[in-house]
Regions:
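Structural preference for solvent-exposed beta-strand-turn elements
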Residues: 1-365
Length: 365
């Protein structure tokens, strides 16, 4: 293999590829990236056996070839090279890297044992979404997935498509986050996708990117521009989350999102010891009193709101509340409640594409 490529181009490819490299694998070849040079194009493939990334770019290929090179070492080298042409030459498993007056010689590995990328057929369900919608939906739901490894179906984000609506759902047992976006697809689909894969892909694309999504029985493919990501689906049945959404509503509160969020975050400043992470809300007479109490001290703050229905006293894990509020971009939010023991729904005013449901914490009188 012999090729010439701009330093900034190879760094771009490496940064993308390293998002799927297995850093602590017992299989040495998984710590490497497969380089394939042919037809004046360089393709890099990386995998941790759960997620696979393929990314490519045009360059000057003088001799076709392929080889596996250690990701960490190669990445460290090319990122330190000057912005000049990088020559990459291989002979057998020997790798030569030349840029300006810098020369490096590495040991590579033959590509024969590198895992093949998953294959999806033209008959698999396929549709397109906007990069901005994908980025926002993952941001608005990913934080609510469970970290409990004994419940793998809740470790991922549930994707559910009905006709041209794609829904992102995350549950951890204490809160539920849902984000809806439009697609150009038609049909129904259900898949539990690994959160990490979705989050890594959103770091690769731009908001103005177009993303093609394709699903098989075992994998989902996300493709944008010159980059593809394959992710193995979590093969479990998801919870019937719609039952959770069906709740009676006796009180409806409208409040400025930023003022409410800032007040919750200020109350949380006294909860940093980690022993208590509780904020209390006393809602009545178009006012929300927000208080916290810990060994460090106490806080108390009032903010205005508009309330329909009876007032209520309710308490929450402060982090659960603030994470949901940070996911909302609107100026005002609507909070729907049914007393102090049932969960509340929070969603942007005049926007039903996102809803966040969180359980309260029972406290004594």
């Amino acid at each position: 293999m012999r090729l010439k490529i701009k330093q900034e181009d190879i760094v771009k490819l490496i940064n993308i590829s390293q998002r799927a490299v297995s850093s602590k694998s017992s299989v040495q070849i998984l710590e490497g990236i497969l380089f394939i040079a042919q037809n004046n194009r360089l393709k890099l493939i990386s995998t941790d056996m759960e997620t696979t990334i393929e990314t490519s770019i045009d360059c000057m290929v003088e001799e076709d070839g392929e080889i596996v090179i250690n990701s960490s070492l190669f990445g460290d080298i090319v990122k330190k090279l000057p912005r000049d042409t990088v020559n990459i030459n291989t002979k057998g498993t020997d790798v030569e890297i030349i840029c300006g007056k810098s020369q490096f010689y590495l040991n590579g590995q033959l590509s024969d044992n590198f895992p093949l990328s998953p294959k999806l057929s033209d008959e698999d369900l396929s549709f397109n979404i906007k990069g901005e919608d994908l980025i926002n939906s993952v941001r608005r739901t990913g934080f609510a997935t469970s970290t409990d490894l004994t419940r793998p179906h809740l470790n991922g984000i549930f994707l559910e498509m009905k006709e041209n609506n794609l829904r992102f759902v995350a549950i951890d047992g204490y809160r539920l986050a849902i984000s809806d976006i439009e697609t150009d697809g038609k049909g129904n689909m259900e898949a539990i996708v690994q959160k990490k894969a979705l989050e890594e892909f959103t770091k690769i694309i731009n908001e103005d990117s177009d993303v093609q999504v394709k699903k098989s029985e075992s994998h989902i493919l996300l493709e944008s521009g010159d980059t593809k990501m394959f992710s193995r689906l979590i093969d479990k049945k998801y919870l019937d989350y719609e039952i959770i959404l069906k709740m009676d509503v006796t009180s409806e509160i409208v409040v400025n999102k930023i003022k409410f969020q800032n007040a919750i975050e200020r109350a949380s400043l006294l909860l940093r010891d980690g022993k208590v992470n509780l904020v209390k809300l006393a809602i009545k007479d178009d006012n929300i009193n927000i208080s916290s109490n810990s060994e460090i001290g106490t806080s108390n703050e009032d903010i205005a709101c508009k309330i329909k229905g009876p007032g209520l006293n309710i308490a929450f894990n402060a982090r659960y509340l603030t994470e949901g509020l940070r996911a909302i971009d609107s100026e005002e939010i609507v909070i729907k409640a049914n007393g102090s023991l049932d969960p509340i729904k929070i969603y942007p005013k005049d926007d039903e594409s996102y809803v966040y449901l969180v359980l309260p914490v029972r406290v004594g009188n």
